[in-house]
C-alpha cells in the first residue's frame, strides 16, 4: 500500500464525514502511509520534512449535513481538516477538494449537493 502511494502521480481519496471525522478504514490507510523515513522525516534541527513528492491529491468529501465554512456546524467538521493536516505532514500541502454536502437533508438538498459537487469536479484541471 505504501509503495503504491509513493509510486502514484495522482491519488484520489473518498472522505466521508462520520460523526465529525474520517472513517476508521481511512484512518488505518493513513497510518500505513504516514511512515517515518518513507513519507516524512525530522531534520537534525527537528523540523518536519515531507517526503511524499509532488503528487496530485484529490479529496472527494461527502457530508450528510452542512459543515462548510459559514455553517453553524463548521467547527464540528474534522474530516477535510484532518486530511489536509495529514497530507501536509508528508509534504502534500495543496490537495484539490470536491465537497458534496447536505446529502442526508432530503431529496432537494441531496440533488443540490450533488450538483454543486459535479460543478467542482468539472472545474478541476485535467
Report each predicted region and the residues it spans.
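Helix-loop-strand module that forms the ligand-binding subsite of alpha/beta enzymes
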Residues: 2-75
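Glycine-rich phosphate/pyrophosphate-binding loop and the adjoining helix
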Residues: 69-126
Amino acid at each position: 500500500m505504501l509503495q503504491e502511494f509513493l509510486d502514484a502521480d495522482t491519488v484520489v481519496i473518498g472522505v466521508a464525514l462520520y460523526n465529525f471525522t474520517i472513517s476508521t478504514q481511512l484512518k488505518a490507510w493513513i497510518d500505513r502511509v504516514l511512515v517515518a523515513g518513507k513519507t516524512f522525516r525530522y531534520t537534525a534541527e527537528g523540523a518536519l520534512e515531507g517526503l511524499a513528492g509532488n503528487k496530485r491529491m484529490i479529496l472527494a468529501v461527502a457530508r450528510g449535513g452542512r459543515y462548510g465554512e459559514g455553517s453553524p456546524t463548521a467547527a464540528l467538521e474534522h474530516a477535510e481538516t484532518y486530511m489536509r493536516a495529514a497530507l501536509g505532514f508528508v509534504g502534500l500541502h495543496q490537495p484539490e477538494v470536491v465537497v458534496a454536502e447536505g446529502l442526508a437533508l432530503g431529496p432537494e438538498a441531496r440533488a443540490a449537493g450533488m450538483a454543486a459537487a459535479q460543478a467542482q469536479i468539472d472545474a478541476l484541471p485535467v
